[in-house]
């Protein structure tokens, strides 16, 4: 739940300043905060005016921006830092910050126009998050996390409450192409919310009764594998935190996640930032309604983009390996076992 931070092109320094050192710090920050620009946007710049560094550009979250300022301060640059970064997503009128794809399929492009800018297709009924408006296009984030520009008329704008109906709950995934009476073709691979009794929620908000011969049902919440992953993770409770550990003698955060999944025949990469590039995006800060027990959380820090990972247990609880070892804590500030260290991550 990522891209390169560019911070050097707008810096203008007097000759007596350590220009090369600043560029080296920025280059290092670029490498540390890099993840996958297909699902993350960050383009931050700096301008120097006397003893003030103005941070500008665009970003999803403030933590990496604060991290850059922190690195420069630690290097001895005693400037005043002003954060003027434009944070995404933009604010949309009437809280219509979400959308449902209303075309049989539409290509999401890395730029609104141009050759070889194709990212990934989005299918009819797919829920997307609106990121920004640019002329006749909207930049959106698809259900699998990809960013892409699509024409404005390729989706129906909705509020969060309606969007959740398409993102959360039992789904019907079409196993063949289906042509409706109105001529609309639902393509194989399309997912629509299943309301029960062969009733589907269509992309336009209407409902349709359709024989299950055309689709199969999937219900992520009732997958027994989720509880089995949690059971495996709980076998590590109270083990010490060991950097690089993945044995019964101790584990680090990604070692716990990796092994809990491996015990259930799911093999993940070793490190947290690698795991973050696997699977489907199911939540982001400020919206976690779709998260289910067994999902993986990632935490950002000011030193680099992904600094910690944990397994979600439901109701705000996570199991993770941190300083005191493997433990169950809460990410809800109102809970007695709330971990403020996770809030700072």
Q: Where are the model-predicted features located?
A:
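Boundary regions of SH3-family modules and the immediately adjacent low-complexity/disordered segments
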Residues: 70-92, 113, 141-239
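Short glycine/threonine-rich beta-strand-turn micro-motifs
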Residues: 42-72, 137
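Structural motif
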Residues: 126, 190, 294-295
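Aromatic- and glycine-rich peptidoglycan recognition patches
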Residues: 157, 216, 283-287, 307, ...
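Catalytic cysteine-centered active-site loop
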Residues: 241-255, 259-291
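Gly/Ser-centered flexible loop/linker motifs
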Residues: 16-50, 106
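SH3/SH3-like (including bacterial SH3b) beta-barrel domains
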Residues: 41-45, 112-124, 179-188
